[in-house]
């Protein structure tokens, strides 16, 4: 039986050669085609006059700052170019007295659709598409369970899966590729913002990062909610094909649809994982830049204040501590006698390793019940509680050990969702921590 799912590569090559396709669209030509497509959608009959095309080209020419003197000639050249490349079809007859009628071709519709409608990839649109797919697969699976001859399967199972479900899957796949391009554009915008004036661009970067993370997560939740149900329906149809050698073309279509659905869902999770990694990279860069750039920012502000002094006068207050005088007699000899008596407890030496081992054992005993009882660990609260029991000189070591021990027990589910926690104060000296609640423990 002839394969009805797709043309072979040689067939496509010969088809392209026979029709002599050759595509070349400059920016102004592409803008002209998009303008024609949008204007065509507003027409009830789908037909365009040459005067309509010239008016559209005039607007494009104004946007691109092109000469008005040669407008008519350039418009005719552009129209002929689109006709030659089969973006437009031209119709004329003896009854039109030399006036031609134009219709946009399927190729023109496809190119314009890519640049116009496919940019609108929203959760609502995805939900509607998946809802249509679910209804089509449901009807196809019900028809498959009824059984029937090959003609029945072609009309009631193969046709809706081939010409409705498969096309919607292709549309979703194309939209996801547009999302990939959109992410690259956002990365370029963030890089441009950070390279110009990063301390003023932090808020804009945060907004771009959060919006993209939220969109990816929302879209993936929608895909996950529908993915398992769609796969179950496809398996339901596939089970009806057992022993039906005459329906191999349906079985091959089902396999292709399953692969497309797996690719669509896996794309979403992969996109989220990659974006989370990029998100963390940007935040690490910002934190490093802030730590390394404090003096440069102060210097910039100072230079700017000096330049604007006459417009906005200001006062500079300085403070200078008095120098300590050397009161020791140069001729006095140092006392090299050995000190006797007991050393105060504050000056007693205790090895750092002994201190750390003591703290580790205490923290392990303190955190173990959280894991045993399945209770979430709020690092901010734990750090505040434990640091209050230690002198300030040990706060850094204690905090580091607590965090190390807590991370060994598990992780926070919000970390994988690109949710950034608020800063929490952990002592009275200005120390803060930024950490999500640990609610997933290692087995």
Curated annotation (Swiss-Prot):
Pfam family, one: MukF_C
Keyword Phosphoprotein: no
Protein name listed in UniProt: Chromosome partition protein MukF
Localization in the cell: Cytoplasm, Nucleoid
Transmembrane segments annotated in the record for this chain: none
Superkingdom of the source species: Bacteria
Subunit structure comment from the entry: Interacts, and probably forms a ternary complex, with MukE and MukB via its C-terminal region. The complex formation is stimulated by calcium or magnesium. It is required for an interaction between MukE and MukB.
GO cellular component terms listed in the entry, alphabetical order: cytoplasm; nucleoid
Major subcellular site: cytoplasm
Encoding gene, per UniProt annotation: mukF
Family: Belongs to the MukF family.
Gene Ontology BP terms: cell division; chromosome condensation; chromosome segregation; DNA replication
GO molecular function, one term: calcium ion binding
Keywords of the record: Calcium, Cell cycle, Cell division, Chromosome partition, Cytoplasm, DNA condensation
Region Leucine-zipper, annotated ranges: 209-237
Function: Involved in chromosome condensation, segregation and cell cycle progression. May participate in facilitating chromosome segregation by condensation DNA from both sides of a centrally located replisome during cell division. Not required for mini-F plasmid partitioning. Probably acts via its interaction with MukB and MukE. Overexpression results in anucleate cells. It has a calcium binding activity.
InterPro entries: Chromosome_partition_MukF (IPR005582), MukF_C (IPR033441), MukF_C_sf (IPR038198), MukF_M (IPR033440), MukF_M_sp (IPR036141), MukF_WHTH (IPR033439), WH-like_DNA-bd_sf (IPR036388), WH_DNA-bd_sf (IPR036390)
């Amino acid at each position: 039986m002839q394969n009805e799912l797709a043309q072979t590569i040689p067939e496509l090559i010969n088809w392209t050669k026979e029709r002599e396709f050759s595509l070349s669209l400059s920016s102004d030509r592409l803008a002209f085609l998009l303008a024609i497509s949008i204007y065509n959608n507003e027409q009830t009959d789908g037909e365009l006059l040459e005067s309509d095309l010239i008016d559209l080209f005039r607007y494009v020419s104004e946007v691109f700052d092109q000469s008005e003197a040669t407008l008519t000639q350039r418009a005719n050249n552009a129209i002929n170019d689109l006709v030659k490349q089969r973006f437009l079809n031209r119709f004329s007859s003896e009854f039109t007295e030399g006036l031609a009628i134009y219709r946009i071709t399927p190729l023109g519709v496809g190119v314009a659709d890519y640049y116009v409608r496919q940019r609108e990839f929203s959760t609502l649109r995805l939900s509607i598409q998946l809802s249509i797919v679910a209804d089509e697969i449901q009807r196809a699976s019900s028809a498959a369970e009824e059984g029937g001859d090959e003609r029945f399967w072609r009309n009631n199972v193969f046709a809706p899966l081939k010409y409705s479900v498969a096309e919607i899957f292709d549309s979703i796949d194309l939209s996801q590729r547009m999302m990939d391009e959109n992410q690259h554009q956002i990365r370029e915008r963030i890089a441009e913002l950070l390279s110009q004036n990063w301390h003023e661009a932090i808020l804009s970067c945060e907004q771009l990062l959060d919006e993209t993370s939220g969109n990816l997560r929302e879209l993936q939740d929608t895909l996950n909610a529908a993915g398992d149900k769609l796969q179950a329906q496809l398996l339901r149809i596939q089970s009806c094909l057992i022993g039906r050698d005459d329906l191999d073309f349906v079985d091959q279509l089902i396999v292709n649809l399953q692969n497309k659905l797996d690719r669509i869902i896996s794309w979403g999770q992969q996109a989220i994982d990659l974006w989370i990694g990029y998100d963390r990279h940007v935040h690490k860069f910002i934190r490093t830049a802030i730590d390394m750039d404090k003096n440069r920012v102060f210097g910039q502000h100072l230079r700017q204040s000096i330049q604007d002094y006459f417009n906005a006068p200001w006062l500079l207050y300085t403070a200078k501590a008095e120098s300590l005088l050397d009161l020791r007699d140069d001729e006095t000899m140092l006392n090299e006698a050995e000190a006797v008596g007991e050393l105060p407890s504050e000056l007693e030496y205790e090895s750092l390793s002994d201190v750390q081992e003591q703290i580790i054992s205490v923290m392990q005993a303190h955190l173990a019940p959280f894991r045993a009882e399945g209770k979430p660990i709020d690092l901010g609260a734990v750090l505040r509680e434990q640091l209050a029991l230690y002198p300030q000189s040990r706060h850094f070591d204690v905090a580091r050990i607590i965090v190390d021990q807590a991370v060994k027990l598990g992780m926070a589910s919000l970390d994988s969702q690109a949710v950034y926690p608020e800063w929490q104060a952990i002592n009275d000296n200005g120390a803060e921590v930024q950490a999500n609640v640990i609610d997933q423990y290692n087995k």
